[in-house]
């Protein structure tokens, strides 16, 4: 059985995702498509616009055969930990043959070579990286500049025809991180990539293949929902229509964050991504702000990107400060939490029961993992801003079978 893994958020699922699924099946000759999907909070550091169960159903209705939840300790982390959590999960299942991801690059050669450099970390590259970090640049910017300088230097033995701009594009960065994780884990899973079609990741203009950002922006701007009819699969359109009064946005968590900070300021510095006094800057900014946008504007600087600050705030909302999340996200994913499957997915699960080195979780009350406890708390937190979600849904909701 040729099982292909994909890693996605489907926030929400759109035509570009359908293109990815179709091309993946064609390129990988897949018998089964397994999706590791972020839960109720996504890598941008925001609540998902629609809950994880509904998004899993849309995925299973649109070409995915099995959906497994990526624990939020990974989904609410940098690209490196996000990728490591998802790839380690796929690797531990024991029967996944390949993964396929979308990228702006569209070819594996350069992505894989750059991944190898970043895993090996040659001395010359590390020295340049340190210089940029010392100048106050964010890690992503420092790494991009350091890699470009390293590739241009006579010290580099790699192909000088490499695309040096790979690390300037969001999906390329994730692709590099997926490959880095495969290399570190000494995995036998083979990576494939397809060229991303349509809007760039952060583009806000609606097109035939629109980015998830553009779709969310249109919904938040209260545009007529009919404008999305041809931007998303029918199941997603129906899902959005049915949930139009319970869609979630990052602004909704602001008051909860502000109250928590005002009553327990010291807990901010217990978050895994907090350093260099950013917790004090966040606290002082909160005193002056009345919404998330103004808070982000006041807090962002050269070292701390918008996404990193957004993740810190959402981690705080969920309660990352109560767990040793730094240790959790540096460890391979310890379990596979099943959200839903179809007939093909059912056969894949039978295969995983023979080969997996981690438990396949269908009932959360049977297991005691810190990462799982954090996910249960994430659902409780999400229920505060999405009234269609019960805080105990992780215990009561049945696995989706289509």
From Swiss-Prot:
Keyword flag RNA-binding: yes
Residues noted as binding ATP in the record, renumbered to the chain: 7-20, 102, 171, 196
Keywords, in A-Z order: ATP-binding, Cytoplasm, Ligase, Nucleotide-binding, RNA-binding, tRNA processing, tRNA-binding
One example of a Gene Ontology biological process annotation: tRNA modification
Any one Gene Ontology molecular-function term assigned to this protein's record: ATP binding
Entry-linked SUPFAM superfamilies: Nucleotidylyl transferase
GO cellular component: cytoplasm
Source domain of life: Bacteria
InterPro entries in alphabetical order: Rossmann-like_a/b/a_fold, tRNA(Met)_cyd_acetate_ligase
Function: Catalyzes the formation of N(4)-acetylcytidine (ac(4)C) at the wobble position of elongator tRNA(Met), using acetate and ATP as substrates. First activates an acetate ion to form acetyladenylate (Ac-AMP) and then transfers the acetyl group to tRNA to form ac(4)C34.
Similarity comment: Belongs to the TmcAL family.
HAMAP family: TmcAL
Name of the protein in question: tRNA(Met) cytidine acetate ligase
Gene name linked to the record: tmcAL
């Amino acid at each position: 059985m040729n099982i292909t893994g994909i890693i996605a958020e489907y926030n929400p699922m759109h035509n570009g995702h359908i293109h990815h699924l179709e091309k993946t099946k064609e390129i990988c000759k897949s018998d089964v498509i397994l999706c590791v999907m972020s839960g109720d909070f996504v890598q941008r550091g925001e609540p998902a616009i629609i809950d994880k169960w509904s998004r899993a159903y849309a995925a299973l209705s649109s070409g995915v055969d099995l959906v497994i939840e990526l624990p939020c300790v990974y989904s609410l982390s940098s690209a490196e930990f996000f990728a490591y959590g998802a790839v380690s999960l796929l690797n531990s299942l024991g029967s996944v043959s390949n993964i396929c991801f979308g990228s702006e690059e569209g070819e594996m050669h350069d992505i894989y070579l750059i991944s190898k450099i970043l895993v090996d970390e040659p001395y010359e590259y590390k020295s340049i990286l340190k210089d940029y970090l010392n100048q106050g640049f964010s890690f992503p910017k420092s790494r991009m500049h350091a890699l470009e300088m390293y590739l241009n230097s006579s010290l580099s033995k790699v192909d000088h025809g490499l695309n040096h701009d790979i690390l300037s594009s969001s999906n390329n960065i994730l692709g590099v991180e997926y490959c880095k994780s495969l290399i570190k884990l000494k995995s036998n899973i083979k990576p494939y990539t397809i060229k991303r079609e349509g809007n760039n990741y952060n583009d806000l203009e609606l097109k035939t293949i629109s980015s998830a950002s553009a779709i969310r922006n249109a919904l938040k701007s209260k545009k007529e929902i009919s404008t999305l009819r041809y931007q998303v699969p029918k199941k997603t359109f129906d899902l959005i229509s049915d949930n139009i009064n319970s869609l979630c946005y990052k602004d909704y968590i602001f008051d909860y964050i502000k109250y928590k900070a005002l009553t327990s300021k010291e807990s901010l510095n217990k978050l895994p991504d907090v350093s260099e006094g950013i917790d004090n800057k966040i606290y002082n900014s909160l005193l002056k702000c009345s919404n998330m946008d103004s808070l982000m504007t006041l807090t962002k600087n050269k070292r701390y990107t918008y996404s990193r600050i957004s993740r810190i705030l959402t981690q705080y909302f969920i309660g990352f400060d109560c767990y040793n999340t730094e240790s959790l996200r540096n460890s391979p994913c310890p379990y596979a939490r099943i959200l839903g499957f179809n007939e093909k997915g059912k056969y894949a699960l039978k295969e995983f029961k023979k080969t997996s080195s981690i438990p396949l979780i269908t009932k959360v009350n049977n297991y005691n993992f810190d990462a799982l406890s954090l996910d249960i708390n994430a659902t409780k937190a999400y229920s505060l801003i999405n009234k269609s979600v019960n805080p105990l849904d992780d215990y009561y909701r049945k696995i989706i079978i289509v």
